[in-house]
């Protein structure tokens, strides 16, 4: 957005410079109850991953306790966390999804 300043009777336009937005990781956390197939479905549905990518992340969640689904600006990451959490609750799974600053 341009801001106008008056110096000595002249108006000059000065542009604000914005840096890139902070990015946030969306992370799935392992639990002992959510089926692996459901985790793959979540990854495909909400993160547009193919079966191979979704399976790789699901196995990382299963084996290491957590897996990064993607990195997004804050508002998109928060939306994805809410969508995944609501979908898991709707299907009665305790799958946890969080966001962390990248």
UniProtKB/Swiss-Prot annotation:
Superkingdom of origin organism: Bacteria
InterPro entries linked to this entry: ClpS, ClpS_core, Ribosomal_bL12_C/ClpS-like
GO biological process terms held by the UniProt record: protein catabolic process; proteolysis
Subunit comment: Binds to the N-terminal domain of the chaperone ClpA.
The protein's role, per its UniProt record: Involved in the modulation of the specificity of the ClpAP-mediated ATP-dependent protein degradation.
Family, as annotated: Belongs to the ClpS family.
Protein name: ATP-dependent Clp protease adapter protein ClpS
Biological source species: Dechloromonas aromatica (strain RCB)
């Amino acid at each position: 957005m341009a801001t106008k300043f008056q110096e000595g009777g002249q108006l000059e336009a000065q542009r604000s410079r914005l840096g890139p937005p902070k990015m946030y990781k969306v992370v799935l956390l392992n639990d002992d109850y959510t089926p692996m197939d459901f985790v793959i479905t979540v990854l495909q549905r909400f993160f547009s991953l193919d079966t191979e990518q979704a399976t790789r992340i699901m196995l990382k969640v299963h084996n290491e306790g957590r897996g990064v689904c993607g990195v997004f600006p804050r508002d998109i990451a928060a939306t994805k966390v809410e969508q995944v959490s609501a979908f898991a609750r709707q299907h009665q799974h305790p799958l946890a999804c969080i966001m962390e600053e990248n």
